[in-house]
């Protein structure tokens, strides 16, 4: 029987992307919906790290299985690091990706390229179901990845999700391709989530996944 690992999300995009990034052939990856987990954790942390911890602990306690949680978002220099932990709800609790993108573009309207710097941030947290951290008592393990770039003038590309259509990764010229125009393979080579996943993978391997 393959070991079971919960990916503490209801986002089909995050579940698919983390599955592709972690490539845990020996493990069965399950979402909260796969396991019929009701309710949602209260994401009231002030940082990505805090919210990743909250979500990982919620999932591990609810399922009695090891759980990996992702908390991620975008930090814009001109907004003093905003939207930050409010990334998903930037334009409101029920906002779509398009709503959030439009609000961010509006907030930066008129700013020159040099002032549109931003970075994607991802924190992954691993929690075990009995309150222990990995390796029998150490604190919950977290891994962090970032991807530097800038906010485009307008959306381009239908790939990815979130703010990908308005995020030009570092290395692209102004007006160059956004993450929404990258293939999945290209995105996985540089994205914040990919970098965090590469750092978390040895930890998961160590624990039999």
Say what each PLM segment does.
Residues 2-6, 10-31, 35-209:
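Anionic-ligand binding patches
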